[in-house]
Amino acid sequence: YDKAIELNPDEPETYNLRGVTKYNLDDHDGAIGDYTKAIALDPSNPVYFDNRALSKTEKQDYAGAVEDYSSSIELYPTDPETYYQRAMVKVSMNNKYDACLDFKKAEELGSTEAKAEIKKNCK
């Protein structure tokens, strides 16, 4: 990916893919840097925000992860997985009320995973 970036430094997807590789190698700081560059080049792609949120979650930067998931939802408000993932982060933050709102929205949009989490976390 380094060579591809050298040849075409304005291609956001290359940064995203390198970020995914770094994420898989547990280099979350490096991944966040690459996702941030991808977002700077193309702030309209919700996947870049989702991916950065995953790395932020791994680093326990829960507030940052929620912010990125929220940005993704603004761009693509019908993706149940993003609501589900944001809810899981909110559970980690011990914010079950808001998590339950997201789980319910995820379920409404078709997430089967959310249904089990609603039973577990939402009373």
Regions found by a protein language model. Give the residues of each.
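Alpha-helical tetratricopeptide repeat
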Residues: 1-123
